[in-house]
Structure formats: C-alpha cells, structure tokens
A protein has these predicted regions:
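Glycine-biased, small-residue-rich flexible motifs in mid-sequence functional cores and linkers
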Residues: 1-24, 90-91, 98-226
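Short, small/acidic-rich helices and loops at N termini and domain boundaries
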Residues: 1-99
Length: 226
C-alpha cells in the first residue's frame, strides 16, 4: 500500500529527511546534507530510490561525507514510515518529493538546491502546475488594508487567477477567504499545522470542491517555531 502512495524516490527521501515516529536517535538530514547527497547521486547516475538497496549505502556515505551508520539508521525506519503513511492517508494528506514529476517546477527553478526535499499537501494537486498571484501582508491589517486585500482577491477570482498566500491571520487569511467566497481558488503555503488547518470548517468544503490546496514543506503536525 505504501508503494501506491509514494514513489521509491520519495520513500527514500522521507526516510532520509522526514520527521515521523517516536524514534529520534538519528537526526534527519538537513537541506544542505541532502543536497550534498543529491550531488553525489547525480555524479554516479543514481536516484534516491537506489539508496533503499543496502549495498549502495557505503558508497553513498563515502561520496557525500555523511556517516554510514546514520544513513543506515534513517533508511531503516520503514516500519515507522508505514504507520505514518497510513495516518497521512486517513487524513487526505499526500506527499511529493523533488524527484517526483508533480513537484512544482518554479520551486526547482528559483530555489534550486534550496528547494524543499519534501512537500506535504491536502487538496487539489493540479493547482501546483498553474499560475497564481501572491498576496501576503500584516497579521494586524487595518480596515483600509482589509478592503484592498478583498478587492484584489475578488479580482483574481473573477479572472480565474489563483491566490497564493501563507494562510496566517490577517492579510493572508483574508485574501484566501475572499477569493474562495467569490468563486475562485486559493493555494495556502503553510509554515505549520497542515493537518489542523485542513480539517477546519472553512477549509473542508473548499478542499472537497477542488478550490483549495494547502501545502507545506514541514511535517503535517509541525508547529511554527521561528
């Protein structure tokens, strides 16, 4: 069932970079460490999924400079990942990685090696491929700012332009709600609580109608700590 939900590449990337389960004995790879590993994979013409074969781990360790035991421990979390996948599926959460065809091209183009290795999402996945207008701003917006935000978001809805925002209180949430209320579509790029946000009453129907996509590079239960 896991193979129907994840590609082999994404499975390997989650094992290496993902936070799940109760075992914290080995720290998942940082973005920099994963990028170093990717450079080695490209050099030897291999893919992340190839690391699921134990006979490749020694070479990967030597080529990337990442401790072999750490790689083995992270890649050995298959049982824990299986439980996590079942929970994500129950809650309508899907996962894509930088190696997947659905991964946003703009992320790779503009962020390059800094593009998140993983993206967790809920909702209309096809919205990843379209255009959009970013609307972000203060959490404590005044009345004039709120009115302007609503006008711009409604204009986007009428012109079939998705609104892309952060989903936080204030301008972000106002813009997303306004475009949805006007019959448009919205994409929320979240820094925390993807799961919690996806089950809120205001989001559930829009997700079911295919009008809302919630996306996060962090674990679905992660909280914002900055």
């Amino acid at each position: 069932m896991m193979n129907d939900f994840l590609t082999e590449d994404t499975k390997a990337i989650i094992l290496l970079c993902g936070v799940f389960g109760k075992d914290r004995s080995e720290k998942p790879l940082s973005l920099g460490e994963y990028s170093s590993l990717v450079r080695w994979l490209i050099k030897v013409k291999m893919r992340p999924g190839d690391l699921l074969q134990k006979d490749t781990i020694h070479e990967a360790s030597m080529g990337s400079g990442i401790n072999k035991q750490r790689l083995e421990s992270l890649l050995g979390r298959g049982v824990q990942l299986g439980f996590a996948v079942e929970e994500w599926k129950r809650n309508g959460i899907w996962v894509i990685s930088r190696s997947d065809i659905d991964y946003p091209v703009r992320y790779k183009k503009h962020l390059k090696n800094n593009a998140p290795p993983l993206l967790f999402g809920v909702g209309n996945r096809s919205l990843l491929k379209g255009d959009g207008l970013g609307i972000v701003g203060s959490r404590n917006v005044d009345q004039a700012g709120e009115l302007f935000t609503r006008q711009v978001a409604e204009f986007c809805a009428y012109n079939r332009m998705p609104v892309v925002s952060g989903g936080a209180r204030g301008v972000d949430q106002i813009s997303m709600n306004a475009t949805l209320e006007a019959g448009g579509v919205a994409i929320g790029i979240l820094a925390e609580n993807l799961l919690k946000k996806s089950v809120e009453r205001s989001a559930r129907q829009a997700i079911a109608d295919g009008c809302l996509l919630l996306l996060s590079p962090y674990h679905p239960n992660a909280r914002f700590t900055a």
